[in-house]
């Protein structure tokens, strides 16, 4: 059968929060079957636990923030994208601050950390959410849609009236049965415009942002000396965000997500709409791994 997955070993990292600019210590620990991904604010007494779930998202300004009784865990989407890409179901994520570390602005460092910890299969079937019918949410000219698909596919399009974007592909579609998340999506960094940064900082946002953890664009060009990691890195990062946001459903998906200019708020609205329409999805397991339309890399054997 396709089994649930957790980590083999504890893994630690240190970084800064993209929006708070605060130093943050992160520890990721293995967790039992059916735990899900649980964030723990260990800087608080008593410690507050917030499970990654669609209905736990309380703020969606520039990131997905989990909120419970006024306690926050911000910018969870890049880490959750790495967890989704590696098919990890269960983990405890301990944090010393109200925001995940931004690392280099992509999911790449998280993928590396998780692979270094090693992935362990558990004694229970992995649960998938299979999309059974089309569901769409809209806001102005933005849309987010789920459609049935025998596998996991993400199609995303963006529209920026800007010289840097006009010369690059603003549409990408990836079927994850044939394309590696780790190779094609994980390294895409978040991006921002110089013109927005002063305003964001006046709102106490993007305080930790720099060319070390984001692609920064002025009126005409990309300011990062090394340029882009993928020619379509902008739209690939929006896919990365969406994959992380969708993992807040709590299980891996069997279906296609189609986003047009969608962001964290609309992605979350789609999850809530799917959960509201109980006939739009079903939870499935696979006794025979060869029957599954989705596959994951074999667990990486970490040093014992």
Swiss-Prot record:
Name of this chain's protein: UDP-3-O-acyl-N-acetylglucosamine deacetylase
Biological processes annotated in GO: lipid A biosynthetic process
NCBIfam families in the cross-refs: lpxC (TIGR00325)
Amino-acid positions noted as binding Zn(2+) in the UniProt annotation, renumbered to this chain: 78, 237, 241
Catalytic class of the enzyme: hydrolase
Active site: 264
Catalytic reaction(s) noted: a UDP-3-O-[(3R)-3-hydroxyacyl]-N-acetyl-alpha-D-glucosamine + H2O = a UDP-3-O-[(3R)-3-hydroxyacyl]-alpha-D-glucosamine + acetate
Role description: Catalyzes the hydrolysis of UDP-3-O-myristoyl-N-acetylglucosamine to form UDP-3-O-myristoylglucosamine and acetate, the committed step in lipid A biosynthesis.
Any single Gene Ontology cellular-component annotation: membrane
Cofactor names: Zn(2+)
Alphabetically ordered keywords of this record: Hydrolase, Lipid A biosynthesis, Lipid biosynthesis, Lipid metabolism, Metal-binding, Zinc
Single GO molecular function: UDP-3-O-acyl-N-acetylglucosamine deacetylase activity
Species this protein is from: Alcanivorax borkumensis (strain ATCC 700651 / DSM 11573 / NCIMB 13689 / SK2)
Domain of life: Bacteria
The EC number(s) this enzyme carries: 3.5.1.108
């Amino acid at each position: 059968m396709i089994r649930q997955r957790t980590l083999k070993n504890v893994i630690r990292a240190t970084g800064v929060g993209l929006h708070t600019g605060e130093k943050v210590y992160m520890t990721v620990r293995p967790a039992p079957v059916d735990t899900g991904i649980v964030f723990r604010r260990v800087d608080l007494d008593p410690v507050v636990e917030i499970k990654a779930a669609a209905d736990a998202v309380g703020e969606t300004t520039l990131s997905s923030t989990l909120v419970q009784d006024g306690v926050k865990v911000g910018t969870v989407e890049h880490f959750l994208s790495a967890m989704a890409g590696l098919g990890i179901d269960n983990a405890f994520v301990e944090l010393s601050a109200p925001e995940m570390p931004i690392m280099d602005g992509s999911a790449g460092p998280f993928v590396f950390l998780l692979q270094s910890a090693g992935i362990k299969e558990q004694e229970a079937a992995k649960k998938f959410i299979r999309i059974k019918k089309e569901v769409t949410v809209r806001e102005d000219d933005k849309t987010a849609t789920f459609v049935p698909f025998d596998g996991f596919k993400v199609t995303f399009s963006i529209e920026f009236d800007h010289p840097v974007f006009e010369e690059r592909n603003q549409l990408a579609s990836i079927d994850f049965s044939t394309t590696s998340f780790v190779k094609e999506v994980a390294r895409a960094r978040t991006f921002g415009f110089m013109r927005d940064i002063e305003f964001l900082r006046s709102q106490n946002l993007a305080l930790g942002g720099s060319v070390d953890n984001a692609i920064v664009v002025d009126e005409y060009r990309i300011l990062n000396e090394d340029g882009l990691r993928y020619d379509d890195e902008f739209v690939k990062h929006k896919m990365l965000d969406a994959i992380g946001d969708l993992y807040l459903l709590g299980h891996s998906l069997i279906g296609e997500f189609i986003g047009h200019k969608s962001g964290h708020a609309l992605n979350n609205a789609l999850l809530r709409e799917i959960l509201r329409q109980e006939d739009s999805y079903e939870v499935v397991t696979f006794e025979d791994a060869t029957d599954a339309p989705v596959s994951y890399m074999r667990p990486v054997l970490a040093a014992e």
